[in-house]
Amino acid sequence: MSVPAELIEGLKARYGEPQRRYHTWDHIEALKRHFDGLADEWHRPEPVLWALYWHDAIYDPTRPDNEELSAQLLEEDGRGHLGAEDLAFAAQIIRATAKHEVPDGLSDDDRADLALFLDIDLSILGAREQVFDQYEADVRAEYAFVPEDAFRAGRAKVLKSFAERPAIYFTEEGRARWDAQARRNLARSLAQLED
């Protein structure tokens, strides 16, 4: 189970684009460490791995359709490397990152994989305080074109949407690993944004 080296090199170039501060190859490597650490949990690891590599491949903070464009890029790049069913599932995972919600109509195994992927993608919310603060600074840098007041209001809305969820994470694994720290980080960040 691997992604061809020439595709990885193309992705690294994308993740190195100048508008990125958080959504870089470092983010992908962090998720890959979580993916590897949870190796026994995945039912369909290959499409999950491909989704992991491509989920932020297209990233333009001025556009609302990055996830869709990333899924389409995966569908192009993955053709001939993944079977049709795996490719469709990998693209579905990427599309689910737009709202960080698990869609209906999945098998139990696919639902579990997609939920766990969304959890590792949001693991940054439950990172150590210093790591989370750097994440917040990096997100602000990616949206440097947005005036401060508008950014603060928009960012507070996004963070509140997670903080107000009964469970930020979908899986027991995610809740055990990251929920408590995520709630502390979100509360602290929201207090700063609303100050």
Q: Which ranges hold each PLM region?
A:
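Short, well-structured alpha-helical segments
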Residues: 5-12, 25, 29, 49, ...
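Short, flexible active-site-proximal loops enriched in glycine and acidic residues
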Residues: 43-46, 64-66, 82-86
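Short gly/ser-rich anion-binding loops that grip negatively charged ligand groups
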Residues: 21, 60, 64, 80
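His-Asp-centered metal-binding catalytic motifs of divalent-metal-dependent phosphohydrolases/nucleases
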Residues: 31, 45-61, 70, 91-98
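Divalent metal-dependent phosphate-bond-processing catalytic cores, especially two-metal-ion Mg2+/Mn2+ enzymes
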Residues: 16-23, 29, 33-44, 54, ...
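Histidine- and acidic-residue-rich, metal-dependent catalytic cores
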Residues: 14, 70-104
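Hydrophobic (often cysteine-bearing) scaffold residues that line and stabilize catalytic clefts
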Residues: 27, 66-70
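Acidic/polar low-complexity segments with low predicted structural confidence
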Residues: 1-2
